[in-house]
């Protein structure tokens, strides 16, 4: 019984040591470039509608209403 317990403890210690030396994997963030929506018309006042239109119609990653002088415009974000 004591031999079994020492094997379990040894396996646990080996697992802890292995986990301590494991490097965390980091995913590199992809840069996004912005440009005004080509399908949006008028002043942008609804972020969700702008986002959906950018994603569905222009195949962008994201979209939002941003202030660009003189009004809010729908801006789409694409991978650079």
UniProtKB/Swiss-Prot annotation:
Domain of life: Eukaryota
Keywords: Antimicrobial, Disulfide bond, Fungicide, Plant defense, Pyrrolidone carboxylic acid, Secreted, Signal
PANTHER family: DEFENSIN-LIKE PROTEIN 1, DEFENSIN-LIKE PROTEIN 13
Outcome after substituting residue 71 to R: Slightly decreased antifungal potency
Disulphides: 33-80, 44-65, 50-74, 54-76
Residues annotated with Pyrrolidone carboxylic acid modification: 30
Chief location category: secreted
Gene behind this protein: AFP2
Role this protein plays: Possesses antifungal activity sensitive to inorganic cations. Induces potential changes in fungal membranes and increased K(+) efflux and Ca(2+) uptake.
Record note on what altering residue 57 to R does: Decreased antifungal potency
Record bears the keyword Signal: yes
Annotated phenotype, changing residue 39 to G: Decreased antifungal potency and increased sensitivity to inorganic cations
Annotated organism of origin: Raphanus sativus
Protein's name in the database: Defensin-like protein 2
GO cellular component entries: extracellular region
Presence of the UniProt keyword Phosphoprotein in the record: no
InterPro entries with a match to the protein in the record: Defensin_plant (IPR008176), Scorpion_toxin-like (IPR003614), Scorpion_toxin-like_sf (IPR036574)
Family: Belongs to the DEFL family.
GO biological process: defense response to fungus; killing of cells of another organism
Signal peptide boundaries: 1-29
Compartments (UniProt record): Secreted
Effect listed in the UniProt record for changing residue 41 to R: Slightly decreased antifungal potency
